[in-house]
Amino acid sequence: MSVRATISDSKSDFHKEFPYVIPAIYRKLADELLVELHLLSHQKNFKKDSIFSTGLKEVFSKFTSGYKPSEHATKLFDAICNCNGFNPTEINNSSEQLVSNAKSFTKEDLNSFLSKTNNDNKGYDYYSRINAIGIYKLVSEMPLFKEVKEEDLNKEINDISKSLGYQYSRVEKDISMYKSNIEKMKQALEIIALNLKTK
């Protein structure tokens, strides 16, 4: 019988694959994602699908904006995934495919995609906040919703959440927190850039 990996095991594997210093501003993100993926790897009713993959890529890319050296960002993502048994190449490919498809999705295409996702995920109903970000990224890429009012966009997110069996209140809260944290990260990076210029 295989021994269940602990969070200490995951962190040890992570540092072996990524033996670099993580800049302080990005450290919290790396730690939170590492812990979250570790917990998800032990959830029997969790399934990694294209919405989750898209959410994970979106969170990582937004919160590692300006990472130096830039080539370390890719290594960081790979290490966070690998140390928890997630395949970074599969996640990248799955995310890229969905984002590419979403750019030409009609309402019918969206409904068909959601129906297929539901069928594929039967028995796997564990919700992660990363799924919420995947939903947000999905609708953000669809031309159908580019010019709509925020209330209409929220209604669509509500409909998608319900169709996937997620509580909209949780999805809405996670998206709202995500957007707020992005803004804080932007401001922090601007302050750092300003301080570097004045030195």
From Swiss-Prot:
One annotated Gene Ontology cellular component of this protein: plasma membrane-derived thylakoid photosystem II
Any one of the GO BP annotations: photosystem II assembly
Pfam families linked to this entry: ThylakoidFormat
UniProt keyword annotation of Flavoprotein present: no
Sections of the chain in a coiled coil: 167-198
Xref: InterPro entries: Thf1
Keywords attached to this entry: Coiled coil
Record's keyword annotation contains Chloroplast: no
Family the UniProt entry places it in: Belongs to the THF1 family.
Entries under NCBIfam families matching the protein: PS_II_psb29
Role of this protein: May be involved in photosynthetic membrane biogenesis.
Protein name: Protein Thf1
Protein species of origin: Prochlorococcus marinus (strain NATL2A)
